[in-house]
């Protein structure tokens, strides 16, 4: 499986600019990769105190991710700021080329950065079988807790 990581300049709190920027990167990967890994909170940057940036699962970010996965025939993973049941989450996603999306919310919020003051933590792991690989999608600080990610 070919995996591509996109590390690019993020436009702070500017979803539209970030979506345009990421799509330009995706266009260069057409036919060259199976899975694209996007940065944490790729549409906004790490804007923990701007809760108005949070989106529901039927918002622009998710709809765009599904379109990209289908159009470019690849899987995409990363995270974005999600809102659900009046709570805000740093939500990991994995979108398959057919548009099927799976999500889980970041479990270990980074209190030293104040993330826990604005976000709610998740309680499940995201494990995807894709191209015969089992992939455990983790967001940033979650990788510091291998026992949780391995045993939960």
How should each PLM-predicted stretch be described?
Residues 17-28, 143-150:
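Short, acidic/polar
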Residues 7-12:
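Short polar catalytic/cofactor-binding loops
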